[in-house]
């Protein structure tokens, strides 16, 4: 096999391909890029770690067709430092790969293409097309609340659903939950405006990699989703991302959201986050090998008092608020609270709560012009020590 790549094209392709490279070092082929070259100028590049993978088709001058696997990390490093505009990759019958550009050359050992794990074939008429920036934005609001090694496997990922023309995303663990729903320009796979209801759970590692791949400043860019019971494919221009799905029924999240709270607090989101970041100097300080992560909030009239104390010091701040209902004292894991506030994309927010021991809801303020989506972020408090 012999291929001549343009340096800018192959470098642009390698970066997203790394999303599908295995880091567990269990199978050598999953640490590599499968290169499949066919005459006259088509080159297909694939990475796959058994759980998720990326495939790209790029233009290249194919002098001799063939296929092989090269180390992803070494190949990406080599093509990045090559000086010439063109990079020539040659792989001989002994699986010796030679990479040449200008006066520079590198050699490395390749693997036969037959060693690459078989990629699941997905034949499905179920799916939809949506704006990339909308899907990415909804993922950004919910990713922080996904479970990690939760005993309930369905919580170790991001739940997507399409119903009544709306796209929903939900994530949840034992302490926090994020939900987002928005009406957007969805299309069926046949190009029509009729979209069948659908739902799936994408594993958290796949969520993180897909989020990177969806990054596109062009708001007209689309992502097309094809799904089956066990697997899913996202097509974004020249990039195809495929992943296994988490099987099982997602929790009935609407049932656990408390709606009728008797206390409402209205405040500036950035000002609140700034005060909590000050408190984080105390809450995230290690004392005797452990981290004291709780922050205490006291809503009294038109002031929210924020305090944190450890064996080495304390922090105190105040934020002006609008306040409906009784005064209250409540405590939270400070980092969870900050993450929830960062996910709520609004200038002013509403916090609804009832007691120091029940969950709170964080939402964009109803009067906020930025609040076009149906976003809700729920967080459980922690029990305060006397």
Spans of features found by a protein language model:
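Structural preference for solvent-exposed beta-strand-turn elements
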Residues: 1-386
